Amino acid sequence: MVKYDNQKQLKCSFCGKTQDQVKRLVAGPGVYICDECIELCQEIINEEFEEDIDMGIGELPKPKEIKEFLDQYVIGQEKAKKALAVAVYNHYKRINSRIKPDDVELQKSNILLLGPTGSGKTLLAQTLAKLLNVPFAIADATSLTEAGYVGEDVENILLKLIQAADYDIEKAEKGIIYIDEIDKIARKSENPSITRDVSGEGVQQALLKILEGTIANVPPQGGRKHPHQEFIQIDTTNILFICGGAFEGIEKIIESRIGKKSLGFGAEVQSRKEKDLSEILSHIMPQDLLKFGMIPEFIGRVPIVVTLDPLSKDDLVRILTEPKNALTKQYEKLFELDGVKLEFDKKALGLIADMALERKTGARGLRAILEEIMLDVMYEIPSSDNIEKCIITEETVLKKAPPTLVYSDAQKAKKKIKKTESVS
């Protein structure tokens, strides 16, 4: 505070009020500012800061726009993309709305993605976070255990999100967390057991509070909580949780519920092999998840259940070529950096898709297959001169012949890469 000077009446350089008209007058090099102007400046800064952090309703993409963005990265799964687009739009619309205390309360709706391995569950969640420009974290449910046992506490999931937000808690509180392998924490048996299920039902119980919305205490360095430790507090009310799992065998539970009950002559019998798996999964109900081993309280906190279809051969071929970051486009870019144009024969792409289906790894297995095929090619080409084009054929995929090379000489002679001796 500036002391009163009888020689000169000090006044605020901004509003012009004298020292005796205000409570405080702060002095700087040749200037003064009063407490009223400081308060006004603080209000202006706070308003601008809130506008920067809050995603306005006008800026929030509409469900159709969200689906169009997902289409650029995720092939197929039309029903799942539509359901996710609506769910995510409603979630962030709820966050951005300024609801009065006496108004209708909009509850959070977390999402459960259910589908085979490699069908695009993780990619869908990652792509949503990319579009919305919010912090995103992936957690593995299999590493979680109930508090007090060896393994990770559920609060460590939140630490990953805080780290993704560069420890900006306000930003993290509007993020997305994808919990993978959620089916692995199913109750080990349908009936409650005397022995404690610390990595199954116990984890489900521990997740309930953060899924619903609570002020969680997170250890800054991760690991177990202990007394006299400082914690980071984070409100999970507006964090969107997307849980994903393959739920292998749940189709049998659904079938037993919707299947025909009649027996004897004339009974209508239809085996699961004759039914389409995606059609069976589309009939999933909460009681099926309950019978699988998920507890009722957990099911209630993930009300939106989205099923993903198994990927067909055509889907896998499209995944190889169509998305913005398609695998073939990535390899083409790598070869382009060496001045070589890379092409994949249509039959070769079909064969790669067949191999992925045979391995039952879905889209996730495509990269491993391509790495095996491309190893010798990527080893030889950087050392070869004057190569203009490299064509991956069906024979190359089967490892019966090297790829076709087009050289940039006058004759455009086609040559073959000599097979490198394989070490058995």
Swiss-Prot record:
It comes from Thermoanaerobacter sp. (strain X514). Residues 1-53 form the ClpX-type ZB domain. InterPro entries: AAA+_ATPase (IPR003593), ATP-dep_Clp_protease_ClpX (IPR050052), ATPase_AAA_core (IPR003959), Clp_ATPase_C (IPR019489), Clp_protease_ATP-bd_su_ClpX (IPR004487), ClpX_bact (IPR046425), P-loop_NTPase (IPR027417), Znf_CppX_C4 (IPR010603). ATP-dependent specificity component of the Clp protease. It directs the protease to specific substrates. Can perform chaperone functions in the absence of ClpP. Pfam families: AAA_2, ClpB_D2-small, zf-C4_ClpX. This is ATP-dependent Clp protease ATP-binding subunit ClpX. ATP binds at residues 116-123. GO terms for molecular function: ATP binding; ATP hydrolysis activity; ATP-dependent protein folding chaperone; protein dimerization activity; unfolded protein binding; zinc ion binding. SMART domains: AAA (SM00382), ClpB_D2-small (SM01086), zf-C4_ClpX (SM00994). Component of the ClpX-ClpP complex. Forms a hexameric ring that, in the presence of ATP, binds to fourteen ClpP subunits assembled into a disk-like structure with a central cavity, resembling the structure of eukaryotic proteasomes. Zn(2+) binds at residues 12, 15, 34, 37.
